Amino acid sequence: RGFTRLTKEIWQFEAPFDIRFRDLMAHTVRHLMKCGFNVVYGYSESDEISLLLRRDDDTFKRKTRKIISVLAGEASAAFSVAHGQTAAFDARVCVLPNEKLVVDYFRWRHEDSYRNALNAHCYWMLRKKGDSVSRATEAVSGLTRAQKHDLLFEHNINFNELPAWQKRGFGVYFQTALKEGFNPKTDETVQVKRQILHTDFELPLGDDYGVFVLERIV
């Protein structure tokens, strides 16, 4: 809540993107995926987090108000403790009736991240050159996507070469990993499978991302 003011004016993170803030958000997503809900995929762009729960998740008997309050509280606590300063998250629940709408939702978020990143880089480039808030906002709002790319390129910024996480956000999901264990019955070292959280800063694009999300639905 109020993250734009907090990040740019009070905490003074680098604009438009700061890897320190990204890592705080990644920490928060990982916490939410281990705090008691059956979350199979977490996605974050900017200061927003989207969680995909298992179809059969019955945490708090699926009571929407309870889910919202607990997840918002967990996110707020995890971020605040990691950062050392207070932050507050709100939350909402979207109940989607089929797999297509789930995929569409995450693809929309993916595309929204791209649009926001392009606008943010243009806006903050102009601000750092000395433009006022109103002048920079007006200048960016009247440009097409291609013109925004050109504007950045004129100032030695190739948007296509910027880090993927800035343009498309990042995902967190479970992967199976082999780890070395010990079998006391046979007195042998064995390989065991474990589910570990993986943070992916290079998500696939377009239709490939749709397939990726579909594979996470269980």
Predicted regions, residues:
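Regulatory and interdomain segments flanking nucleotide-handling catalytic cores
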Residues: 1-218
